Design a protein with these regions (language model features):
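Hydrophobic faces of well-ordered beta-strands that scaffold small-molecule active sites
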Residues: 10-14, 79-82, 97-102, 131-138, ...
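Active-site-proximal alpha-helical scaffold in enzymes
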Residues: 1-7
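An alpha-helical appendage that flanks or caps ligand/catalytic pockets
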Residues: 32-68, 109-220
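Glycine-rich, proline-tolerant flexible connector loops at the mouths of alpha/beta enzymes
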Residues: 22, 103-108, 226-239
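Acidic/polar active-site rim loop that often engages polyanionic ligands
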Residues: 19-30, 94-96
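Conserved, mostly hydrophobic/aromatic
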Residues: 2, 46, 79, 92, ...
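Structural motif
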Residues: 5, 95, 218-220
Length: 252
């Protein structure tokens, strides 16, 4: 229906999820490994449902002949798979899906590693037209170093909490996890403000353009700003305005 109402503009993104907190509430006993297996069964089934008159008899789902209606305008509807490990890259490419990757807070070295994994998957499936590859990164554009340091500090806070949620060890009350302590900050120098400034896409418009050009040269053909962070509304607004006004024209 969304594809019809948007006149064929829908892209469908599928991922296995990340947090044990979510797995435990979705299905007790579910872990990342099984979530990945379920995703691998789900994706081909969704592709066939969009074609229509599809019967499924899998390990996790079984249903009689079924069709998704109304029929989508796009044939096929573009599907994106979030991937980090080589097996997921290979699965996505083998099934004709586009791929989205993120280096998280690991920097440009990891950006290249992820591209290498994608290229390996494409080389293993020469019969499949090369899918698109999207890079997702936390991005903050500002004019002064003072603003950039403040933005980097907000990203540090985000990743500290991201890791705490991921470990699923801290108590959660009223939907919020316990606050980060100074000891936890000190124990993770890899998430220092300086490293956030270097590893995330943080910089002046010219600096951000230069790094985006380097990703384009690697072979990435789409970019997505990871906006979720510990920044204020005003920081996010000003960041987006600068990106739109001064970064995007370089790629028009």
């Amino acid at each position: 229906l969304c594809d019809v109402t948007s006149n064929g503009r829908v892209d469908l993104g599928i991922a296995r999820g990340a947090y044990m907190f979510e797995y435990e509430r979705l299905m007790p006993g579910l872990d990342a490994m099984e979530a990945g297996l379920r995703m691998r069964e789900l994706v081909p089934a969704v592709q066939q449902l969009l074609i229509g008159n599809y019967t499924h008899d899998g390990d996790y789902w079984k249903f009689p002949e079924t069709t998704a209606v109304p029929r989508a305008i796009q044939k096929p509807v573009p599907i994106w798979i979030a991937a980090r490990d080589p097996h997921t890259h290979d699965f996505a490419v083998a099934n004709g899906c586009n791929v989205q990757v993120t280096p998280l807070s690991s920097g440009d070295g990891e950006v290249q590693v992820l591209m290498d994994k994608f290229n390996t998957a494409c080389a293993a499936h020469p019969e499949i037209p090369r899918p698109k590859l999207m890079l997702l990164m936390h991005t903050y554009v500002a004019k002064t170093e003072e603003e950039l340091v403040k933005g980097s500090a907000a990203l540090q806070k985000f990743f500290l909490y991201f890791g705490k949620w991921f470990k699923a060890e801290a108590p959660i009350k009223d939907g919020f996890i316990e606050p980060i302590t100074q000891a936890e900050i000190d124990a993770q120098p890899n998430l220092s403000v300086e490293n956030m400034r270097k590893n995330c896409l943080v910089g002046t418009p010219d600096e951000v353009i230069a790094r985006l050009k380097s990703y384009e040269e690697m072979g990435y053909n789409q970019f997505s700003i990871w906006l979720d962070s510990a920044m204020t509304y005003e920081q996010k607004r000003d960041n987006l305005k600068l990106f739109i006004d001064e970064v995007m024209p370089a790629f028009a």
